[in-house]
Amino acid sequence: MPASWPPRTVIRKASGLRTLESALYRNGLGPVAGVDEVGRGACAGPLVVAACVLGPNRLESLAALDDSKKLGEKERERLFPVIRRYALAYHVVFIPSGEVDRRGVHVANIEGMRRAVAGLSVRPGYVLSDGFRVPGLPMPSLPVVGGDAAAACIAAASVLAKVSRDRLMVAMEREHPGYGFAEHKGYSTPAHTAALAELGPCAQHRYSFINVRRLVTAGTPQISGGLTDAEPGQCCELG
């Protein structure tokens, strides 16, 4: 393999979803793990990061990942158990809102990616991350622009993270009724903003986010109870 591999620090989508992964496997750098997150921009709920290792061969049962950007909720739910079944390894990490506040979103995101890779039962030879460079990994890695549309392992990690977080937000709505978490999943929508103004923030809101902090500064009552903040770095391996 030439010393210049990879030829650029950031690679965009090539001719197919498995092109980059196949090149890494051919050059002896497998297994290849993909890492992605969901919930960076939400003002409530955890940041969820998933890492996933797929085998070198394309599986027809995961063909829908080729259009992962277009997947709706039902298709993601259908793919979720299929990915868990056929992945060589996967790990999902939940960074609670309190830790996001303490660390900041970007630092929490990078730390979550490191934890997700560290939790894999199969040690990857190479890691592909969706858009963000992940320092501190014990193996080579590459940030990929639009990664969930450029590498199957990142697309699979994206589905695992998205479904895991969405399910948690639905459960959070039962613990904190009135905010509409099951619908907007913690993102700042007009309905969420109206609920925040009426009810005040709860323990699952990110107080470092300006729309939440502004309400606290204005003296809006805060609601506690329900789901508690997880310990820093709490993670779970699904399946």
Curated annotation (Swiss-Prot):
The gene is rnhB. The keyword Membrane does not apply. Keywords: Cytoplasm, Endonuclease, Hydrolase, Manganese, Metal-binding, Nuclease. This is Ribonuclease HII. GO terms for cellular component: cytoplasm; ribonuclease H2 complex. It catalyses: Endonucleolytic cleavage to 5'-phosphomonoester. Its main location: cytoplasm. InterPro entries: RNase_HII (IPR022898), RNase_HII/HIII (IPR001352), RNase_HII/HIII_dom (IPR024567), RNaseH-like_sf (IPR012337), RNaseH_sf (IPR036397). Endonuclease that specifically degrades the RNA of RNA-DNA hybrids. HAMAP family: RNase_HII_B (MF_00052_B). Its EC number is 3.1.26.4. Its cofactor is Mn(2+); Mg(2+). One of its GO terms (molecular function) is RNA-DNA hybrid ribonuclease activity. Disulfide bonds: none annotated. Gene3D superfamilies: Ribonuclease H-like superfamily/Ribonuclease H. It comes from Mycobacterium sp. (strain JLS). GO terms for biological process: DNA replication, removal of RNA primer; mismatch repair.
